[in-house]
């Protein structure tokens, strides 16, 4: 059911954002797959993250929806303060209020227009131009995957994380359906970060 939900949401919002459908679809799969239906927070993701954090006995982290991330972007916060219980409660409260008061399209538009993609690139237009000398409308599916993957840790690359994402069935389907190949994706990471060989090793190819 989630596959159809993400696909329908991607079709809807890509038109509003003048952005390729495959970019929006990959963004949802990587960052917030229930964006179209949750009230600003994702109860399922919160429960999974809570169980994980209790097991790890560490700071609260994970499960942040696009609306929750937008709250952090607006405040310009980062680091441990964003993982404190008090901060998380404020973030949840604001994201639910914003999701009730604003349209989902406006939340998504503000997010992609302001979020940090690394290398001093804030917003999708700057990231597309800076990394690929492209516009948001001309992004290929390989470039879209790269940008969606970058959001979690824009200042560093994790070969393990990239490989895990490439192994997820919905992401793999979106990539192959739009003509992307594994060598093409790895070549892009090699060109930008020089980690192509490590990725091939990690993937066992």
PLM feature segments, named:
Residues 1-205:
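Juxtamembrane regions of bacterial inner-membrane/periplasmic proteins
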């Amino acid at each position: 059911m989630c596959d159809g939900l993400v696909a329908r949401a991607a079709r809807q919002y890509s038109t509003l954002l003048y952005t390729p459908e495959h970019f929006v679809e990959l963004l949802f799969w990587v960052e917030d797959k229930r964006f179209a239906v949750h009230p600003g927070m994702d109860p399922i993701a919160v429960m999974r993250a809570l169980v994980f954090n209790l097991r790890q006995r560490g700071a609260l982290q994970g499960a942040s929806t696009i609306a929750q991330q937008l709250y952090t972007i607006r405040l310009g916060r980062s680091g441990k303060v964003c993982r404190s219980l008090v901060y998380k409660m404020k973030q949840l409260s604001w994201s639910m209020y914003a999701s009730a008061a604003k349209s989902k399209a406006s939340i998504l538009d503000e997010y992609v227009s302001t979020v940090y993609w690394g290398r001093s690139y804030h917003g999708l237009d700057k990231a597309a131009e800076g990394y690929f000398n492209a516009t948001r409308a001309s992004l290929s599916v390989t470039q879209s995957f790269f940008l969606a993957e970058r959001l979690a840790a824009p200042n560093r690359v994790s070969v393990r994380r990239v490989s895990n994402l490439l192994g997820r069935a919905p992401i793999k389907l979106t990539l192959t359906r739009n003509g992307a190949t594994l060598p093409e994706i790895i070549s892009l990471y090699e060109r930008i970060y020089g980690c192509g060989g490590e990725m091939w090793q990690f993937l066992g190819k």
